[in-house]
Amino acid sequence: MNLSRRDFMKANAAMAAATAAGLTIPVKNVVAAESEIKWDKAVCRFCGTGCAVLVGTKDGRVVASQGDPDAEVNRGLNCIKGYFLPKIMYGKDRLTQPLLRMTNGKFDKNGDFAPVSWDFAFKTMAEKFKEAFKKNGQNAVGMFSSGQSTIWEGYAKNKLWKAGFRSNNVDPNARHCMASAAVAFMRTFGMDEPMGCYDDIEQADAFVLWGSNMAEMHPILWSRITDRRISNPDVRVTVLSTYEHRSFELADHGLIFTPQTDLAIMNYIINYLIQNNAINWDFVNKHTKFKRGETNIGYGLRPEHPLEKDTNRATAGKMHDSSFEELKQLVSEYTVEKVSKMSGLDKVQLETLAKLYADPTKKVVSYWTMGFNQHTRGVWVNQLIYNIHLLTGKISIPGCGPFSLTGQPSACGTAREVGSFPHRLPADLVVTNPKHRETAERIWKLPKGTVSEKVGLHTIAQDRAMNDGEMNVLWQMCNNNMQAGPNINQERLPGWRKEGNFVIVSDPYPTVSALSADLILPTAMWVEKEGAYGNAERRTQFWRQQVKAPGEAKSDLWQLMEFAKYFTTDEMWTEDLLTQMPEYRGKTLYEVLFKNGQVDKFPLSELAEGQLNDESEYFGYYVHKGLFEEYAEFGRGHGHDLAPFDMYHKAHGLRWPVVEGKETLWRYREGYDPYVKEGEGVAFYGYPDKKAIILAVPYEPPAESPDNEYDLWLSTGRVLEHWHTGTMTRRVPELHRAFPNNLVWMHPLDAQARGLRHGDKIKISSRRGEMISYLDTRGRNKPPRGLVFTTFFDAGQLANSLTLDATDPISKETDFKKCAVKVEKAA
């Protein structure tokens, strides 16, 4: 029997599915069994790598999955989470009907959850929305969205809120993970997202990881780095972190530094480049300009907090014109001696790192994730790494550049590109720019002035506004913020449970968030709907619906579009707007936003033969194509070009900008980027002068440090087996068994000093709350003395009852990596 590589992989998947079900299939029957399974492509539901998978369905269920051998990203590989994708949808507690807190048949905030119809749920929601609008205006209602939503779900949320409700109170959970990176991209280059791609891995001479445990968080990319390192003895890997983790196993240089001092380390590197004449002056003079950042900018806490007094919080994001000489003066104090004392790194470690960046013959890729972004100076550290690459000219060329890795499957595609933030519109447009608002109103066919110029509330501000009674309704979709967000006990939970407030959670499972809400809406997930994600390398990937959702569960897209029918323009818009377009009087928001002659212009006949598509069948037109083509109009011709819709179903994803059917691997470089003209060489065309910004900023301390009472640093993060709050992975028996509960990792000598031993039940406390857990002094994570590490996947151990809601004042992203705690034996 002759089998192609693809058929062989599918046969393996069929065998794996049978094994998981406890069955045995004779070898001769494997291919026959595979022939009974229907296969189609999809994208992994987990991290931002964007691995492509083959999904096998039979009898209306997903029964197998396999890494797609034809995919450029993962080349047939999956990580351990990816291999168990079929099981994420079939947890025993899957939600199948709307649930509302009720007593005697009526809504009661303190009542028990009871099943209701979708119409009853939406009528209740609409009543609460309208009450809130009447009480506190357009900003009384908020949406907390997700980098896990599909592109069209994110676009529909944005459109319903910003055009329909005329409120910019939309924020994604990417606020917790990618906001600092996005803001730094915009400030440095005038455009968001990385200039390079994963192809850099096979061409780089050195990799430097800053606050990134790629071995566990991006294991498929790590496998490619490992292959590059092992295949070429001259390639080097450097890992910087505040504790030792599995990525250190491959590292040639493992550097453990004191929290927050990455700011000082990078300023030392810049100082080294200057002192050793390692500046690429030709590049710097042609392609960069110098700015100085505002300092003493605070920590994003409530205004009355002592740390916010006498700060420049109001002008935190301001950048002042500057010069190379001013940068040179600022970094001159960051000597190797001073930074060694600050960071805990020895002089040789620091100099070796600086020499790597200084060597003009070495191609260097810098990777980072949450260690940089979840930081009270996250925008600064992002911009400092850009400084290093810009000063050396090591940017926008194969094998060389700074690369921000994303943690969610569409943090780029849905949160950032779609503009699902309270200050953004699609394709890097912003609500504060009149021309950008006019563009949105033109594309959306709206009266002038519909889109508000007022920036909405970010998620931490939403928490505080709910707690203060200034925002009264919150709809949370596709995330679990009651478990994942900071300072649960003091801000979020009191606001959600406050009398007069109403919280809706759309989710497939009864998460901590869902059980804290007033209304739970059961949601279709992954291949139960047609989808699109945008990964970390600007690659947009599509998949088709392959099975139906259970019971009455509906996709978030259906929920948004159907809910729009419960509001009219007369209720939501001003007389001035209706006078401009009287044809919209009395129309529902659904009719104006979604059945507008653009979104609804593609008939059902354009669906592939036999293709499932519940939303399109319900609404009577190819919803996803209409939404995508309208959305794509924002970016085409402006450096954010997306390909025509149909191309994506044929390809394994395309990296934008896609011009004349050709994707772009390296942006801003002549010969690779169609927006760089002949003879320009490099053009950072996000700015009119096509120059990137080199920003001078100093070290500033964290919001909270250990003291006599709370004597340890706490850093939070993840482990390989689980993803975020474990909503999906803890319902996969194999993953749950592999890592059933959260732990707290501590240095053995710190444990000994407290009379603790490995395996002890402990209580970890901060100024905000406490958590009971178990101690690990021998495991995969090895903190230095003075620091403990824990995860947040375990709903039975709410690690974010400990964390501080301090944020970067520019990006508003929370610092989950640094707060002060104490650890003692539990009673």
UniProtKB/Swiss-Prot annotation:
GO terms for molecular function: 4 iron, 4 sulfur cluster binding; electron transfer activity; iron ion binding; molybdenum ion binding; molybdopterin cofactor binding; nitrate reductase (cytochrome) activity. Mo-bis(molybdopterin guanine dinucleotide) binds at residues 81, 148, 173, 177, 210-217, 241-245, 260-262, 370, 374, 480, 506-507, 529, 556, 716-725, 800, 817. Its cofactor is [4Fe-4S] cluster; Mo-bis(molybdopterin guanine dinucleotide). Coiled coil: none annotated. This is Periplasmic nitrate reductase. Predicted to be exported by the Tat system. The position of the signal peptide cleavage has not been experimentally proven. One of its GO terms (cellular component) is membrane. Binds 1 [4Fe-4S] cluster. Residues 37-93 form the 4Fe-4S Mo/W bis-MGD-type domain.
